[in-house]
Curated annotation (Swiss-Prot):
GO terms for biological process: mitochondrial large ribosomal subunit assembly. A motif (Mitochondrial targeting signal) lies at residues 3-18. It is found in: Nucleus; Mitochondrion; Mitochondrion matrix, Mitochondrion nucleoid; Mitochondrion matrix. ATP binds at residues 172-179. This is Probable ATP-dependent RNA helicase DDX28. A motif (Q motif) lies at residues 126-156. It comes from Mus musculus.
Amino acid sequence: MALAGPSRLLALAVRLLLEPRRNLVVRGSDQSLPVVRVPRALQRRQEQRQSGRGSLQRPVLVRPGPLLVSARRPELNQPARLTLGRWERAPLASRGWKHRRSRQDHFSIERVQQEAPALRNLSSRGSFVDLGLEPRVLLALQEAVPEVVQPTSVQSKTIPPLLRGRHLLCAAETGSGKTLSYLLPLFQRLLRGSDLDSRSFTAPRGLVLVPSRELAEQVQAVAQSLGGYLGLQVIELGGGLGMSRLKLQLYRRPAADVLVATPGALWKALKSQLISLQHLNFIVLDEVDTLLDESFLELVDYILEKSPIAESPAELEDPFNPKAQLVLVGATFPEGLNQLLSKVTSPDSLTTITSSKLHCLMPHVRQTFMRLKGADKVTELVQILKQQDKASKTEPSGTVLVFCNSASTVNWLGYILDDHKIQHLRLQGQMPASMRAGIFQSFQKGSQNILVCTDIASRGLDSVHVEVVINYDFPPTLQDYIHRAGRVGRVGSEVPGSVISFVTHPWDVSLVQKIELAARRRRSLPGLASSVGDPLPQKA
């Protein structure tokens, strides 16, 4: 029994030796065994990946001519005549920008037309006379703004319904002439109203609400230049004042037909019963997408509650109890509009006017995106500003706007530019009112060619002399990018504009990829489209 185990093992070994060998290749003495340097499984995966990549790539016919997108790597260029299909894969130049090795990469969305979309086909839109404006209003327009000869597309769509007394929402690209589109018809309505001698600063007949004191100064200047020829008085009420100074300012101002105010200053005046809105003929919310932000929403809500807004156009002509016409103007569709309208009027009474290029990238402005390390942004900025200054000495050039995301960055960057002997102005919301007063007007008049600012200068401010916008900090949202880029390429701009954006963080790259994809597909920017519909249910 003890020998049974070893005998079995010996029998098994003999049987294995005597069986024929299978799958064995007899090699000669001169043949060597293959050396496996890459595991077969990994090698098969690489072969499958390469074969799959080759099957997805299709030859693209590159046509001669201008480019829509020009990248550092020529294979990622896209001709202006090429349009990608809806389901066709877009070769993004910014696809790998979240990796740190992508630094120093760049691409540009090129200028594909020379004029602003609002100025195209002006001859086919008729004249201001055809829109229903009276001769005295046309004469005031000719004297105040002689360079405006024909209406833009936005003005052609906006003026007739305003003259008919309709509540209006106008959403159009920046720099398309929206200010004149509401001032002209509303001034004409004021002239048809009560006697001008009954004006009172404490009870204006028109109100224009804007988000910043700089925009209030600008709108007041444009409105007063028109109103001066019509016998109308326009007064501006800016923020940043204490109650005592606000009262003093109100008492010193002459009687007014139209008040241009910021939400904070008007809220203080209404709370103190220094101003009444019961005699309003119209109320305009300019840059309404900004006014409906959380920082302004409560103030704007209170102001609208104090305003007698009409339910229908018939109430505007009531001689005993006239109501106000509501006008909303902005460069993007505002969020939260349904909730706001449900408190003051029905959304069905609102006529919506939108432009064909709403939420689209401007086709007449070159936009460059540079992937940079955070520490390299200052060096790149100084180099661009010095090149711009050198070019301005040899040929006519415009001014430069440098946008930052915070007031502290504006101050810090200002000190850096001072060290490099680069003259500039600074504008940010934390400045005292006395320091902020007149800074943007000085920049518009050309006292300095460079303005370092926050988004306070990106909403509505007219900047026809600006040639370059530099996003030192990439804007946090696509709405902010639209507003910043809209400081160039405006109606009446004297120089072709360009935008340069520094891209640093991964969340910046995500927005850049959305912008590039929209440009390559020739579509509007995602996430901005909206509409005005039924009001949302109010909370009990």
